[in-house]
């Protein structure tokens, strides 16, 4: 919780560590991804996957999901207490794709959760290695962010579908810890809080008794996490009001929606980490790379360098475009679903196009899809440059608001203007400024109105050549100032359904 004085870096959150110096952080993050790699290699051996099959991203995802399910204690306990037909609570599995006689075939596998836990611990020096599990969750979350739209979820909680850029991490499980909280967008936190308040409105006992006390603690903790994401005093003060409310109700929901809208211009600080599929770490470990000795960072050059040298394959449906599939996975790998397309295109070195123009569906293949017509192709995950990932929202000069296009949450620390339609955003703020938060609301609206779309964010920050690992020569790109920025314009993606 940022508000409690100790700022830990992402990597410390990621590895559950106390304050460490840069070298120790690099080593512990290295140990974490090395453990994922060793686990993946062992699973490929168990499943007798060929080299090609082990590089298939769909197989990687199945293996990742199996280990996440094996360690999901709450769900395991629930499954044992509520046995459902055809679900063995002690087993986990999924589709594994193999190459047979020039065709891809799907094989459903089933493993004891206990066995998976044993393999995972063995790969992680006998520890539970929760940080590695969280890392996999964040990779899945980043993939969902790039693949699906959350319009329905937004509308259900009374928010506007145009706030999609605030929804990073909306599919992360509750158990994703501090590292998970760091990558959640403002909209995601608001949505979780609104759901909680709505339950309280509909269920009289929600805040009462021993359980209610725990609920209340969770509520206040979530409020503090959200407060820590805001960068202006007025937004934080409003969060204090929401947190201290005796019994949260519609007034708090209104305040939260107001705050979410304000975050389109007064953006929150949301962390971005490049989390790669397990097979990528597996390939590196198999080739003899020692992550712990070399050190690793999720926010620097390392993931770019790893992707430069990894060949990953994906199954492709008959009318999908392999280049588009590659873009989807590239964005997921760098947590760039909400980044300005001009910036992503520059870094990647090929044009990154809005989702509405992509001829590709999600990466995962449903069990009822026909395998006969499935092909596979290499994912192009390399980049022309690398850039440092940011956790700031890109607001200019500290506390003052800057422009935020209606759907951008910057991923890379690279100089750009943040084009936005102030009229569109401000239209949502007419009227209601009375009530107990009126002065804060007025202050927030004033800051938003003084924001200028032509202001430059991340002044002087640039991208770096892949040979420049110490980040000595920033190349500051110049972008045209047009409104070219959002991945979600003209969106026709599928909804995310659990």
Curated annotation (Swiss-Prot):
One of its GO terms (cellular component) is helical viral capsid. InterPro entries: Flu_NP. Keywords: Capsid protein, Helical capsid protein, Host nucleus, Host-virus interaction, Ribonucleoprotein, RNA-binding, Viral nucleoprotein, Viral penetration into host nucleus, Virion, Virus entry into host cell. Encapsidates the negative strand viral RNA, protecting it from nucleases. The encapsidated genomic RNA is termed the ribonucleoprotein (RNP) and serves as template for transcription and replication. The RNP needs to be localized in the host nucleus to start an infectious cycle, but is too large to diffuse through the nuclear pore complex. NP comprises at least 2 nuclear localization signals that are responsible for the active RNP import into the nucleus through cellular importin alpha/beta pathway. This is Nucleoprotein. Residues 1-21 are annotated as: Disordered. Homomultimerizes to form the nucleocapsid. May bind host exportin-1/XPO1. Binds to viral genomic RNA. Protein-RNA contacts are mediated by a combination of electrostatic interactions between positively charged residues and the phosphate backbone and planar interactions between aromatic side chains and bases. One of its GO terms (biological process) is symbiont entry into host cell. A motif (Bipartite nuclear localization signal) lies at residues 198-216. It is found in: Virion; Host nucleus. Belongs to the influenza viruses nucleoprotein family. A motif (Unconventional nuclear localization signal) lies at residues 1-18. Pfam families: Flu_NP. GO terms for molecular function: RNA binding; structural molecule activity. Late in virus-infected cells, may be cleaved from a 56-kDa protein to a 53-kDa protein by a cellular caspase. This cleavage might be a marker for the onset of apoptosis in infected cells or have a specific function in virus host interaction.
């Amino acid at each position: 919780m940022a508000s409690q004085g100790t700022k830990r870096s992402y990597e410390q959150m990621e590895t559950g560590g106390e304050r460490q110096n840069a070298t120790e952080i690099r080593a512990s993050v290295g140990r974490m991804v090395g453990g994922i790699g060793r686990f993946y290699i062992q699973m490929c051996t168990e499943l007798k996957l060929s080299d090609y099959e082990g590089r298939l991203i769909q197989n990687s995802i199945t293996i990742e999901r199996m280990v996440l399910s094996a360690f999901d204690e709450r769900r395991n306990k629930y499954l044992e207490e509520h046995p459902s037909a055809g679900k063995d609570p002690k087993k986990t599995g999924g589709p594994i794709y193999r190459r047979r006689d020039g065709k891809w075939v799907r094989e459903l596998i089933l493993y004891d959760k206990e066995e998976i836990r044993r393999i995972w611990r063995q790969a992680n020096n006998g520890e539970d290695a929760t940080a590695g599990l969280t890392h996999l969750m964040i990779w899945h979350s980043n993939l969902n962010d790039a693949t699906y739209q959350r319009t329905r979820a937004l509308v259900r909680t009374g928010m506007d579908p145009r706030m999609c850029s605030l929804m990073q991490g909306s599919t992360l499980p509750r158990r994703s810890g501090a590292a998970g909280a760091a990558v959640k967008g403002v909209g995601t936190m608001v949505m979780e809080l609104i759901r909680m308040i709505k339950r309280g409105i509909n269920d009289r006992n929600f805040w009462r008794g021993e359980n209610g006390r725990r609920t209340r603690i969770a509520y206040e903790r979530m409020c503090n996490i959200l407060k820590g994401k805001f960068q202006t005093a007025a937004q934080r003060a409003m969060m204090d009001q929401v947190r201290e409310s005796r019994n949260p109700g519609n007034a708090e929901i209104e305040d939260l929606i107001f705050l979410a809208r304000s975050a389109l211009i007064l953006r929150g600080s949301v962390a971005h980490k490049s989390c790669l599929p397990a097979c990528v770490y597996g390939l590196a470990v198999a080739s003899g790379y020692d992550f712990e000795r070399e050190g690793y960072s999720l926010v620097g050059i390392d993931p770019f360098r790893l992707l430069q040298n990894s060949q990953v394959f994906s199954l492709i449906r008959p009318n999908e475009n392999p280049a588009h599939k590659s873009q989807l996975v590239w964005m997921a790998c760098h947590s760039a679903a909400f980044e300005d397309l001009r910036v992503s295109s520059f870094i990647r070195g090929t044009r990154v196009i809005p989702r509405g123009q992509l001829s590709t569906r999600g990466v995962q293949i449903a069990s009822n899809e026909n395998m006969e017509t499935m092909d596979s192709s290499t994912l192009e995950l390399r980049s022309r440059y690398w850039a440092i990932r940011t956790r700031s929202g890109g607001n200019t000069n500290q506390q003052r608001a800057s422009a935020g296009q209606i759907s951008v949450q910057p991923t890379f620390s690279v100089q750009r203007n943040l084009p936005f339609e102030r009229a569109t955003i401000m239209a949502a703020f007419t009227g209601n400024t009375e009530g107990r938060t009126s002065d804060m609301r007025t202050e927030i609206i004033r800051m938003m109105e003084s924001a200028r779309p032509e202001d430059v964010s991340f002044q002087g920050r640039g991208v770096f050549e892949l040979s420049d690992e110490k980040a000595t020569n920033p190349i500051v790109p110049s972008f045209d100032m047009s409104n070219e920025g959002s991945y979600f314009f003209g969106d026709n993606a599928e909804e995310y359904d659990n």
